[in-house]
Amino acid sequence: MKEEMNTSQNYNKTSLKEKIRKLKTKISTDINNEIFSLNSKPVTFKNFLRQKRWSIFIMLIASFLFTVGVHIFIQKAKVVPTGIAALPVLINLIWPSTVKFFSLLYLAFNIPLIIITYKYVRKSFVFLTVLGMLFQNLWTLVFEIDVIKKWIDATISLRNLANKPQDTWEIIFYTLVGGIISGYGIGLGWKFGGSTGGTDFITNYISGKYKKSIGKMSFILSISFAVFSIVIISLMKHYNSNYGDPFTFLQIIGTFIYLLITTTFLNKIYPKYKKMMLTIYTTHAEKIFKYLKETKYWHSFHLWKGISGYTQKEVQKIETIVFYIEIKAILQEVAKIDPIFWFSISPILTTSTRIDTSKID
């Protein structure tokens, strides 16, 4: 009887583990398919919630990280506002009573960008970015709740850790921590098809048109707005003391550090146009080669045959240059023909011809 019970318990444990494993696999597959899929359908307003449910959830997380980094840390460092955020800051300086409407003003300045770029970028990008901005407003409201705000101010303060002047140690610390947290949130948002809004609409359009790194384009645009902010706001503060003290050198340096950190994270998490050499080693190379031709594979590829120096047997491999974010989806297709193939990837620094970007743009 005991043996039967033990057998039953072991079976139940195995069954539960198997169910958990299958669930994890399904979730992982669904998430990867939302990031990039060869068979994805065009996203419309009607099917958006159904096709992008995981992306919506990730945008909630990404907006939380971004808001924590900016609202709690970067705000304490008092760095120069960058991007579209510089415009509501100017309004706040001129009319201090509008400070509490900063988030709404930021949304308002995004509307023209949404209208202008809507025709030229993926609809899912617009939907997810707008949703991400709404989530940012939601988290900002949460952090502004009196009890939470007091707890944050009392807990996250370097004055409790080190007796250093605010314009040195604290600015550096808040900038570094805020840059890392918000940078991860920004990268995560881009990876799942959205962004934090503002100049990201312009970044996405220019990056897609000229096939340039999103991180680099984001840095260039943000730096441009930062310089604009430094010049205009500094002049306003210089001629009218009611607008506050001019920016310090450390605040300006902190701004550039923040932008370097966030764009570094963005490039690392979402290297959209990063090219890789994918080499597939298999005993079914000709079948895979035929499958790629029949399915109208969009990149160039080559079939190589040789003799292994180790086994002295014929070796077959397929080489193709792909974009980094396409790799998982391509390997899934190859696995349908040869489940036990193996592969290697290596970075491509430059190519003589432009690679087809139709699947990722």
What are the functions of these language-model segments?
Residues 2-285:
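Core subunits and conserved enzymes of cellular information-processing
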Residues 2-42, 270-361:
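Peripheral (non-transmembrane) domains and long loops of multi-pass membrane proteins
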